[in-house]
Amino acid sequence: MGGKIRSWHKLFPTFTPADEVLSAMRHRLSQSENITIRTDCKATNISPRCVTLSTGEELQCDAVVVATGSTLFDARIKEEYGYGIYDNVITSADLEQMFNKGEVRLTTGAQPRRIAILHCVGSRDEKVCQRHCSKVCCVTGVKQAIELKQLFPAADVFNFYMDIRMFGPGYEEMYREAQQKYNVHFVRGRISEVSPTIDNRLQIKAEDTLTGRPLKLGVDMLVLLIGMRSNDMNISLEQAGLKRQPSGFMQPKDSFLGNVESNISGIFYAGTITAPKNVGESINEATAAARKVTEWLNKR
């Protein structure tokens, strides 16, 4: 219970430990009445009046909130980056796990001295049919770069990006802090090739599009900022009559006045089931969905 936040170490832009947020939410849940938690099962069929679980049990209901979220892009699809092929090519999700364990190390056990972070892996990429922006990757890359510099002050950290999209409160300030306080390097350009070297490092090729110059860089570790992709369960939701966007995310009833409502009365949405969002936005949507459910029940 807790969704994707369980795998995070600290949350941007305040660097609040994810465990603190989860603990506070679980405490509030434990103090609430008339709530039954079912784990180790999933919904196999959803309608406004009945939810069928994988255990075979049917739950009768008057409203349903679907908050099945999103999943992460499989970095192995982008073979040119070497994930699953070369040592020390990891994803942003892998790095969060390392932060949680307190062990950010190379496969040899040594500390990384030079680290590259690549933005937009599986986002804004027509070649892999992921045209959407995953929204939180840029700020995640900045947050992780700062955490790496806090762990290894002498290390060189490079962020390779197409565009830096700092949309939230405190994000732009964190981006500036990464450059001014932590001396994180930002290079505008995508990495075109990754290859191993004879001394067990990684050589990356890219182009600095601001200077128009090709770039070769030897690094100890490459972090791939993987984007959000729609949950595979959305296909079965579409088969049940719910509308799905071309991106694979579910289509809300209205982007402005019904963003937590579906096209079927009595079924509501919350979180990244409809689009990439940060933690705060997902929590706010859950609150909005709860209010909409209350309104719906009071009308019946």
How would you describe each model-predicted region?
Residues 1-300:
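Residues forming the flavin
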